[in-house]
C-alpha cells in the first residue's frame, strides 16, 4: 500500500511538473508561432529574358550594349561599309550619343532622337560650313519617336506625346513642350515609339506588347493608333502588332507599311520579322497567336489558324530587328529606287551568329508584292557589330541619312553615278 505521505509527494510532483510545463509552454508556443524569416528576394528577370533557355548557348544571350561613349569621327567604320556602284557613304555627324530617330525641319535642321542611353533630342545645324550638335531637350524617358510638321517638333515617350512649337526659331532657347496626348500606357517593354503624320493629317503612334509573349488587352496594347493633331479622335488602325518601330505611307496608294519585330526564344531561326501592309482599318496581324504569317504560337495559338490574320507583305529574317523605314521619293538616286523602301535592320542579339546590321531596299510592284535586296552592308565583323543602323531619312536634296546608335553617328549616302 502507498502511504499518505507518499501520496502527497506524488501529487506535489505532478503539480510541480505541470506548473513547469505551463510556465515553459508560452515560450514554446511563441517560438512555434513566429513566422520563419523570408528568404532573400530574387531579382526579377528583365522582360527580354523571360522565356530564355536556362542552359546552352541561349542562356548566354542578352541585348548588345551600344558603345558607352560615341565613337570619334576618325574611328567610324566608313571604310568597311559597302554600297552599290555609284553610291558613296560619308560622315554627316559624329558624337551624337545614342542617335536613333531622324527628321528634317523646314529650314534644313536635322532632328535626332535617342533611346536608352541619352534621353535627349538633338538638333544638327550647319554653321559656317560646320555641323553643330545642339541638345534641345534632355532627361526624357525613352524619347525615340519624333516628327516634324508645320514648324513644330513632336516627341513621343512611352507615356505621352508633346509638341515643341516654332522650334527652328528657338534652338538656343527651346520652348516649353505642350502635351497633346497622354493616353498611352507608359510601359517600358516595347513602350518606345515611332510616330509619323499620315496623308490624312493624323498622327500615327504604336503601342507595343508589354512583354515578349503574352495575351495583352487588345484595346490597350499590340496596336497602331491614330489621333488628330490636338490629341482627340483616337482610332485603332491595326491590331496584333507586337513591336513596330518604323512605318511609312506608300507615296502612290497612301497605304501604311510597318515593320514588326516578332517574339523571342522559340528558336534561332524562327520566327521571321515582318514588313506589313494595312489595306483596311482595324486589320489584325496575328500577335500573339500567329508569327510570320505561318507559325502558330505554341503557348497562345491553340485553337487559332494563321489564316485568320493578315499575312506579312515581306519576311525579312529571323530576329533581324527591323527599325526605321522610309519610302524613297527623292531625285538623286537611280529610277529603280523611286518609291522603294529603305529599311534598317538593327541586327539580332538573340542569335549565336550575328547578321544584318544593314540597310536594305524593298521594291513593291503594283500588286503589292515585295522583294528585298542589300543596300548598305559591312557592319558585322568577326561575329561582332561594328555599327547598327537605326533609322533612315530622305533629305530634301535626295540623299539618304542613316543613324547608327551603336557608334553615336549619322551617315549620308549620296549617288553620283561615278
Describe the residue ranges of each PLM region:
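Surface loop/turn motifs at the tips and blade-to-blade linkers of beta-strand repeat domains
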Residues: 92-96, 135-139, 180-187, 236-240, ...
